[in-house]
UniProtKB/Swiss-Prot annotation:
InterPro entries: DHBP_synth_RibB-like_a/b_dom, DHBP_synthase_RibB. Mg(2+) 1 binds at residue 39. It holds the Pfam family DHBP_synthase. D-ribulose 5-phosphate binds at residues 38-39, 43, 151-155, 175. Belongs to the DHBP synthase family. The keyword Ligase does not apply. It comes from Vibrio harveyi (Beneckea harveyi). PANTHER family: 3,4-DIHYDROXY-2-BUTANONE 4-PHOSPHATE SYNTHASE, GTP CYCLOHYDROLASE II-RELATED. The keyword Lipid biosynthesis does not apply. Catalyzes the conversion of D-ribulose 5-phosphate to formate and 3,4-dihydroxy-2-butanone 4-phosphate. GO terms for biological process: riboflavin biosynthetic process. This is 3,4-dihydroxy-2-butanone 4-phosphate synthase. The gene is ribB. SUPFAM superfamilies: YrdC/RibB. Its EC number is 4.1.99.12.
Amino acid sequence: MSSTSLLDEFGTPVQRVERAIEALKNGLGVLLMDDEDRENEGDLIFSAQHLTEAQMALMIREGSGIVCLCLTEERANWLDLPPMVKDNCSKNQTAFTVSIEAKEGVTTGVSAKDRVTTVKTATYFDAQPEDLARPGHVFPLVAKTNGVLARRGHTEGTIDLMYLANLVPSGILCELTNPDGTMAKLPETIEFARRHGMPVLTIEDIVDYRTGIDLRNEYKSGLVREVSWS
């Protein structure tokens, strides 16, 4: 069965994006697949703005354990987060920065509660570089400007979805894994979505949805956005 057929139960490409946007607005999670000729993996995504300890615990329990905080380039620069390495030779050019931890309000930094505290600290509208310790247990990723139209990665897809949902442009992702430790492909991702009542969409869906929609100005103004935290 083709990936298109497997995704039919989640709607048309446009419906899949709009259902994901609605879920994120309501503080829920979504599952994002990248291209079949790329990683072909499902990532569990939540907004930083609405992130809860229960959601973080779900990511740690059901995912790879490497919880990443997706940021715009402007936000990463504002927080003084340099690249993890000078020469990024990873296959997909995944833009990790140095890892981070909140300086206040955490113990070891690895618990779900502590990681949520770190995420909230890094994404609060008046966050400063000195609010964060380096290294830590949260791994920031920097999205390319213009999102999936510049790079078809989960990082860019996450930030695009936050903009489309009119949320703070920061999101959390973690690769979904199977019980045996292997990576979840589309069939396993769909089964997880059914169990947890989550929408599923693809990077291709976001690319198609964004065609004709210009988010570049949103990216340029994404350095700071004041929000009411829930």
